[in-house]
Structure formats: structure tokens, C-alpha cells
């Protein structure tokens, strides 16, 4: 315990009511957040002579200050605890690394509804189906639905400006409601209803209706229509046959846990309407010495209760681990959902099968993760040996991307002892430089990244500069001129240049901008980690550049042309069937659009060409 913290005096001031406490170190950083039914009793336990674990001993040794927030109820304390954990990310708490909201499939409330992927708040009018474990699962489902039930998936801006059907209609993936006469209102509404039933897990109803329609078409001698519906029936059956379905038809999340070598994996199965929608593995950040029970309890609390990213709650949650606060968690979730949420730890029947599946997936994912981590550790150890460093705990790499000097973006990617640390990847929009001046771009991004206060834990051991001698010289100059409080001499600056034919394995490394560089064997683990972080940085930079370029392209094409306001833009896009059609049009064709003069048509033509 810190010499400056008087635990005895502090405990005299603490109430026995429920609440949340925050522990701070000497630097004023929150290092632990906890909740208690009885604050005085819980906080007193930290200052006994025989502490429960080495982790608690290490925590107490750093306490400089404790703040307490009293709450009305335990439920209130539980919610506040997880909001504080998300806000402060304390190093001694178990932390859920990936807290992105889950994607849903959105069926809009338009006259001709569209299907789309949706994340975040549900403000738009329509229906939401899910959650799905990730964006890939949603995209895969949307692609499947497009083949079976061809309702539109295009943006409203495209749909409202079509004068002729797009390629999706030509290949049978859309009914073409954008163009009058291609599909009746009744037929489109029927396909939308099939989608609604299918996504709600009511496959039997879909099949019953389709079979009835097929028989009617056959009796009316509409054999082509009957054959089309038959194909639809077969497609639905192929999908449903692959899906293990529970007889209960309930919505539930199933959580399996595996723990080994100080790492935990929590695997969540998402089951809606009795069907497995998908699953996802989580690897929470676990401080050394943490008990598995704390990992599970903290994960479940963070997963469902944290702030604005609160998950969509199923009717039941299955766990393969007993929770000490199971009743409190169930009551808190029920209060949030406005309905009864059951938390069950000893299921039977189908539920037991689901739990076994989640447990198996957790164990498999953990083995894979530990194997990957072992490989990363070996590579970083090899790199430290090559660079003559005691160890490499953190690396950062920079790359620049642009098109002919325009829309320049710099990327910074971060690796730690476990590999890519994607939560800390950053992109920087580069401005105020001569177009195409990569040296100036590198100079700017390094000053923005390192010309400020940096926590000691965030100071990299190695900074990799993609681009060779010239870019390395820029980095050296920047660091020589930095006026910062942290140790700017700690990071090793390393330049990397590809060979003449830019093939992997022919990289040359530079410690200094002058003189000869050196190469590593193609099978060197140290080279492999350099290639990995360099490629990550390159991909991250290109991705940012493409987004920026697309944004500029989409907003500037027509909006910057004088004399073309919102109404004329809409008329041009509608008449030409979109921006691409307008780009391909001649001056004479543009001049035929109502409200467009010959002179304005020429201006539009040349603006789009250049």
C-alpha cells in the first residue's frame, strides 16, 4: 500500500450502503473499479494482513486514493461499475476488448422495403432482425436472401433516381420495383412477407405458402411460374436442412468459457427463434492472478450492461459457470429489458447440447489463440535479438498513401506482445504539403503522433518507417527536434525498403539514413514480423485513402458545378440513370435533360471529364 494513503482514516469515513469505488495510483490514474453491497465491509477486506491473491497485493500496493459513489440499490451499483470500467479501462480489471455493437438485418418501412445491414441505434422506421455475430454473417445472409427472395438492397438515393433497371434485376437478384411495370405491388409485398417470416425463423410458414402458390400456378397451367416457385422452395429447404433447430424456438445466448496459461476465451452462441444465428469468441484482457470466476462475472456484466453499446437481450442466458451474483445479474438485466431475463447454469436437453457446443468452441478458439501468440512471441524475440534490444514489447509502423498526390493519408499501426493491437490503429489526413511529397507527409504524421505527452506504457520500442533511407532521415530529423517530457531516445527507428522488384523477402533494413543497409534471410522470424506490421500499415493506409477518395468523388462530382443545384442534380441523375450514366453521356444528351441549357451541358460535361 502507498505510504501516503491512510487506510484506517479512510475506512472511518466509508458508509455501509451499496455503491461503487474507484482506486487511483500516484499518477491519478484509475487502476481498479469495483462494486459492493456493503462498501465499508468490501473496502476493509483490501487492507487485511492476509490478502486473497498476489493480484490484490499488487493492487493495494499502488493505491494512493479511493473515491466512493453511493447508490440506492445493488442493481444501480452494478450498472455504474460497468460504465466506469468502460470509461477508465483500469489495468487491474478484466476488460472486454471488443465492444462493438452487433449488426442486425434491417427491413425498411419504405413503400418498397429494402434489406440492409445496420449497426447502432435503431432510429430508422422498419424492422430489425438479429443480432448477428459479425458483419460477415450479415453479408452472407443478405447474399443468400437476395438469391431466394429478390427484394431490393440498394440505397434509397439510387432507388429513387433509376429510369431503367440495374444489373441486379437482369441477373434475377432484384424484382426491380424502381421501374414501374416490372413487378406488381402484390408480388413485391408477398416476397417481403416471405423475408419477414424467414428472418423470424418461421420457415415452415414460408414453405407452406410457397407450396400452395406453386400448386395454384400449376392448376392454372402457369408452368413457368410454378417452376420458378419450385426453385424457391428448393432453395429454402437447402438452407433450413443445414440448420440445427431447437424445439423450443426461444431466443437465448449461450456462453462457454475456457481458461489456460493466463488467457481466457469466452465463446457466445446467438440463438434466435430456436436457430443458431452464429457465434463469436472473445479474449478479455485478464490481469495476472485473476480467478476464473472473476473473469466470467466481469465479462458477462460488461457484455450486457456497458453504456450505449448495451446488447439486445435474449429471454435466457445459459452459462457453464456458477455466478456468485447470478440473481443480481438477472434482476439487473430484467430491469433494463423491461421483461423477465433468466440466467441459467444447469440446463438440460437441447440447452445442454448448446452449452457443450459453446464450451467446445471456446476451448478450440483458445488453443488457436495461444498457438498464434506463441508464434508472435517467437518472432518478437528473434527481432529483439537482431536489433540487439532486451525485448520488443511494442512496435509502431507508418505508411503513406495517395493518388497522384491527392487525398494523402498516413497510417500508424501498433503491435504488442500478442500481435496487432487494432484498437490503437490510427489514420491521419495530411494537409498543407506539396502534393506527392511523401517526405513532408511522413514529417507531419510523426510530429502529430509523437510531439505530445505519451504514457510510458505507450512508448514504442521500435518505430518502423516504410520507405527506406529518405523516410528514415525524416524520422531522425523529427525526433531530434522533439521537445517532449517522455524519453524520445527510447524508440529504435528502423527504415525498411523493398527490393527493386518489390517482392516480399527482398527487404533492406536501415538503422541510419547513410551507408549500406542489411537484409535478413527469407525464412527469418524477425523478417516475418517486420513484413506483417509493414503490410498491416500499408493496407490500413490504402483503406483510409480509398475512403477519403470515394468521399471526395461522391460529394464533388456535381455539387461543385456552378448552376447545378439540388433539383437539377436530381433531374440529371434520374434522366441518365445515375452518375455513371451521366459521365458517359455526350453534351447533346445532357442538353436534352429538362432544365439544362446547351451552355450548362458543356460545363457539366467538361467538369465530369476533368
Swiss-Prot record:
Pfam families: GIY-YIG, HHH_5, UVR, UvrC_RNaseH, UvrC_RNaseH_dom
Domain GIY-YIG: 16-94
InterPro entries: GIY-YIG_endonuc, GIY-YIG_endonuc_sf, GIY-YIG_UvrC_Cho, Hlx-hairpin-Hlx_DNA-bd_motif, RuvA_2-like, UVR_dom, UVR_dom_sf, UvrABC_protein_C
GO cellular component: cytoplasm; excinuclease repair complex
GO annotation terms (biological process): nucleotide-excision repair; SOS response
Main location: cytoplasm
GO terms of molecular function: DNA binding; excinuclease ABC activity
Domain named UVR: residues: 204-239
Taxonomy, superkingdom: Bacteria
UniProt cross-references to CDD domains, sorted A to Z: GIY-YIG_UvrC_Cho
SMART domains found in the cross-reference section: GIYc (SM00465), HhH1 (SM00278)
Signal peptide annotation: none
Keywords: Cytoplasm, DNA damage, DNA excision, DNA repair, Excision nuclease, SOS response
SUPFAM superfamilies reported for this sequence: C-terminal UvrC-binding domain of UvrB, GIY-YIG endonuclease, RuvA domain 2-like
Subcellular localization, as worded in the UniProt entry: Cytoplasm
Job of this protein: The UvrABC repair system catalyzes the recognition and processing of DNA lesions. UvrC both incises the 5' and 3' sides of the lesion. The N-terminal half is responsible for the 3' incision and the C-terminal half is responsible for the 5' incision.
Similarity field: Belongs to the UvrC family.
Subunit and partners: Interacts with UvrB in an incision complex.
Protein known as: UvrABC system protein C
Organism: Shigella boydii serotype 18 (strain CDC 3083-94 / BS512)
Amino acid at each position: 500500500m502507498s505510504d501516503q494513503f491512510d487506510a484506517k482514516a479512510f475506512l472511518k469515513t466509508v458508509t455501509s450502503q451499496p455503491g461503487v469505488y474507484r482506486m487511483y495510483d500516484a499518477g491519478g490514474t484509475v487502476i481498479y473499479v469495483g462494486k459492493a453491497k456493503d462498501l465499508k465491509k468490501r473496502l476493509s477486506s483490501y487492507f487485511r494482513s492476509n490478502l486473497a491473491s498476489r493480484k490484490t497485493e499488487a493492487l493495494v500496493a499502488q493505491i494512493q486514493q479511493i473515491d466512493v459513489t453511493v447508490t440506492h440499490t445493488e442493481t444501480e451499483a452494478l450498472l455504474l461499475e460497468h460504465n466506469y470500467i468502460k470509461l477508465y479501462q483500469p489495468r487491474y480489471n478484466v476488460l472486454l476488448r471488443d465492444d462493438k455493437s452487433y449488426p442486425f438485418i434491417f427491413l425498411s418501412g419504405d413503400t418498397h422495403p429494402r434489406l440492409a445491414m445496420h449497426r447502432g441505434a435503431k432510429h430508422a422506421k422498419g424492422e430489425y432482425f438479429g443480432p448477428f455475430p459479425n458483419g460477415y454473417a450479415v453479408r452472407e445472409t443478405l447474399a443468400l436472401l437476395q438469391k431466394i427472395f429478390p427484394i431490393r438492397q440498394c440505397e434509397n438515393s439510387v432507388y429513387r433516381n433509376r429510369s431503367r433497371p440495374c444489373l441486379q434485376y437482369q441477373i434475377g437478384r432484384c424484382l426491380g420495383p424502381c421501374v414501374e411495370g416490372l413487378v406488381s405491388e402484390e408480388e413485391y409485398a408477398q416476397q417481403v412477407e416471405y423475408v419477414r417470416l424467414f428472418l423470424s425463423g418461421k420457415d415452415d410458414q414460408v414453405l407452406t405458402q410457397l407450396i400452395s402458390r406453386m400448386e395454384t400456378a400449376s392448376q392454372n397451367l402457369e408452368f413457368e411460374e410454378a417452376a420458378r416457385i419450385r426453385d424457391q422452395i428448393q432453395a429454402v429447404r437447402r438452407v433450413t436442412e443445414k440448420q440445427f433447430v431447437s424445439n423450443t424456438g426461444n431466443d437465448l445466448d449461450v456462453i462457454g468459457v475456457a481458461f489456460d496459461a493466463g488467457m481466457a476465451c469466452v465463446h457466445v452462441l446467438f440463438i434466435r427463434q430456436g436457430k443458431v444465428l452464429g457465434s463469436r469468441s472473445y479474449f478479455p484482457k485478464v490481469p495476472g492472478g485473476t480467478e476464473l470466476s472473476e473473469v466470467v462475472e466481469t465479462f458477462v456484466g460488461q457484455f450486457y450492461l456497458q453504456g450505449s453499446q448495451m446488447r439486445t437481450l435474449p429471454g435466457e442466458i445459459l452459462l457453464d459457470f456458477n455466478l456468485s451474483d447470478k440473481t443480481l445479474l438477472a434482476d439487473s438485466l430484467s430491469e433494463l429489458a423491461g421483461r423477465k431475463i433468466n440466467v441459467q447454469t444447469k440446463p438440460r436437453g437441447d440447452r445442454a447440447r448448446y452449452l457443450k457446443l459453446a464450451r467446445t468452441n471456446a476451448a478450440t478458439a483458445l488453443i488457436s489463440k495461444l498457438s498464434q501468440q506463441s508464434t508472435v512471441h517467437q518472432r518478437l524475440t528473434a527481432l529483439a535479438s537482431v536489433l540487439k534490444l532486451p525485448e520488443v514489447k511494442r512496435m509502431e509502423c507508418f505508411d503513406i498513401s495517395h493518388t497522384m498526390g491527392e487525398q494523402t493519408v498516413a497510417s500508424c499501426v501498433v503491435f504488442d506482445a500478442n500481435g496487432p493491437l487494432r484498437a490503437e490503429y490510427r489514420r491521419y489526413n495530411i494537409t498543407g504539403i506539396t502534393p506527392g511529397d511523401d517526405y513532408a507527409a511522413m514529417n507531419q504524421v510523426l510530429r502529430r503522433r509523437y510531439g505530445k505527452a505519451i504514457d510510458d506504457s505507450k512508448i514504442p520500442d521500435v518505430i518502423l518507417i516504410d520507405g527506406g533511407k529518405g523516410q528514415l532521415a525524416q524520422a531522425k530529423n523529427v525526433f531530434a527536434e522533439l521537445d517532449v517530457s517522455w524519453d524520445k531516445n527510447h524508440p529504435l527507428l528502423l527504415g525498411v525498403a523493398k527490393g527493386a522488384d518489390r517482392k516480399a523477402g527482398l527487404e533492406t533494413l536501415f538503422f541510419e539514413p547513410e551507408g549500406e543497409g542489411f537484409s535478413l534471410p527469407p525464412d527469418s522470424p524477425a523478417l516475418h514480423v517486420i513484413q506483417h506490421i509493414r503490410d498491416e500499415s500499408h493496407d490500413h493506409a490504402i483503406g483510409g485513402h480509398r475512403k477519403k477518395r470515394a468521399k471526395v468523388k461522391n460529394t464533388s462530382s456535381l455539387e461543385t458545378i456552378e448552376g447545378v443545384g439540388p433539383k437539377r442534380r436530381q433531374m440529371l441523375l434520374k434522366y441518365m440513370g445515375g452518375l455513371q450514366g451521366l459521365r458517359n453521356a455526350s453534351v447533346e444528351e445532357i442538353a436534352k435533360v429538362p432544365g439544362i441549357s446547351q451552355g450548362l451541358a458543356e460545363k457539366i460535361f467538361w467538369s465530369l471529364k476533368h
